[in-house]
Amino acid sequence: MSLKNLTHALFTERFGYAPTLTIQAPGRVNLIGEHTDYNDGFVLPCAIDYQTVIACAKRDDRQIRVIAADYEGQQDQFSLDSPIVSHPDQRWSDYVRGVIKHLQQRNADFGGADLVISGNVPQGAGLSSSASLEVAVGQAMQALYALPLDGVALALNGQEAENQFVGCNCGIMDQLISALGEKDHALLIDCRTLETRAVSVPEDIAVVIINSNVKRGLVDSEYNTRREQCEEAARFFGVKALRDVSPDLFFPIQHELDPIVAKRARHVISENDRTLAAADALAAGDMKLMGKLMAESHVSMRDDFEITVPPIDRLVEIVKSVIGDRGGVRMTGGGFGGCIVALMPLALVEPVRAAVAREYPLQTNGLKETFYVCKASEGAGTC
């Protein structure tokens, strides 16, 4: 059963009437531009064809009722006229509550709603299931009440909800690509200005995501350490963020920095350049150059930012051995486990799947991957 049909059926069963609107917001994968977002840099994600779907309708009072189909049909209910606080034991509810609370702070002119939510964005894989949920809830309220909020505002609203209400530190990339994604395109995002440029993905190229199924330990503490090291490097150069440090400025005096801090800065500064070059390569259909840039990105994450782990490196090597210079592959996401992303001709998807299934468990003491074949998809809207 499709997510739309599932949410409609559950809505009618639990609320006793039919929904008036169905909204979707996608997950995402970042093709290149890792740990550049909080350095005011550039990223190149695309929305994927895994999404959160919400069946919804207005209410004629000030109550929000919400059902999570994927959490055994759990229900939450709260009033728009009372302070919105965290749910005592349903963590999923806090994403909904946070989005609604921050929408109120932006524009209080909306009433109650009934919502039924379901999604197929893999959780815990670094594919932004939480951003997909936040954008979907915001889009649902915007559509029901014709709120004067564009995609950027809905993305910022979701980020604020996650940072301030849920309590998870995140950049703007995940929400922005979920809100603004375009079919068959990646989106070059300037994380300082929030300006975007659509970049076409060649039609014969598949976006493949492979989850290493390595449990991501240390990710929060190491993430915070990397941020602090980047901020230290920016202070050394007297700039707001590493975005403002060019390679010409950095390389002649990198030896004056603490060696570890210099490595972290070298990754960010070179990754920004790679991301801009990758947007041009992808738009031109130059998969050989795109593959080279993705390979350099992975090496930089491994050696300078030090956020890959051996099973991830093995996975990248296995995929690279099959696709050669006909595509690209690298780790994607925060690091210390999670997923790799690969761009490859459709004809190579099954050979890659077979090679990974054969080699990955042998090289990693029995780990088994999860394989997703995706298409660059459109951002949030009705479905």
UniProtKB/Swiss-Prot annotation:
Main EC class the enzyme belongs to: transferase
Key words of the record: ATP-binding, Carbohydrate metabolism, Cytoplasm, Galactose metabolism, Kinase, Magnesium, Metal-binding, Nucleotide-binding, Transferase
Locate the site labelled Transition state stabilizer.
28
> In which pathway does this enzyme or protein participate?
Carbohydrate metabolism; galactose metabolism
Q: What function does this protein fulfil?
A: Catalyzes the transfer of the gamma-phosphate of ATP to D-galactose to form alpha-D-galactose-1-phosphate (Gal-1-P).
Q: Which family does it belong to?
A: Belongs to the GHMP kinase family. GalK subfamily.
Protein name listed in UniProt? Galactokinase
- Report the source organism: Serratia proteamaculans (strain 568)
Gene that this sequence comes from: galK
